[in-house]
Structures are given as structure tokens and as C-alpha cells.
Amino acid sequence: MALSLFTVGQLIFLFWTMRITEANPDPAAKAVPAAAAPDTASDAAAAAAATAATAAAAAAATAVTAAKAAALTAANAAAAAAATAAAAARG
């Protein structure tokens, strides 16, 4: 029984302490998130710049690949047309 009353007393003290802490927050604890905010903003800006650079490089690579594919398709179409014309001329 005494242990139970002691435990209840500890819980009451714990919640009472938490209530006081929430009512009077530490000024230094408030300053830490404010100081960390510029770092977060600069990190976000750097990540956005890196993403934009990666997207631009991917777009350039895609354009080069598309140009190569178009040239290959045109060459294959010309070869097929020449083969069709040669076959038609023979027969």
C-alpha cells in the first residue's frame, strides 16, 4: 500500500512539473528552432537548385537521345523506301 501511495505521489509530482514547464517554457528552447530555421531554408534552396540542375541534365540527355532516335528512324525509313523501290523496279 505504501508503495502504491509513493508511486501515485511521484506521478502527481511528474504531471505537476510538466504543467509548470509547459506554462513557463525555457527561452533558450524557443531560440533554438528560430536559429535553425535559416539552415533549413538554405538546405531547401540548395536541394531545389540541385533538383533543377538534375532535371535540366536529364532533359538535355533525353533531347540528345530523341534526336539520335529520330535520325536512326529516318535512315531506316529511307533504306526501306530504297529497298521497296528496287524491288518494285525488278518486278
Swiss-Prot record:
Coiled coil: none
Gene Ontology CC terms: extracellular region
UniProt signal peptide: 1-21
GO molecular function: antifreeze activity
Assigned keywords, A-Z: Antifreeze protein, Repeat, Secreted, Signal
InterPro entries associated with the record: Antifreeze_1 (IPR000104)
Propeptide stretches in the record: 22-39
Cellular location(s): Secreted
Family: Belongs to the type-I AFP family.
Protein function: Contributes to protect fish blood from freezing at subzero sea water temperatures. Lowers the blood freezing point. Binds to nascent ice crystals and prevents further growth.
Name of the protein in its database record: Ice-structuring protein
Organism: Pseudopleuronectes americanus (Winter flounder)
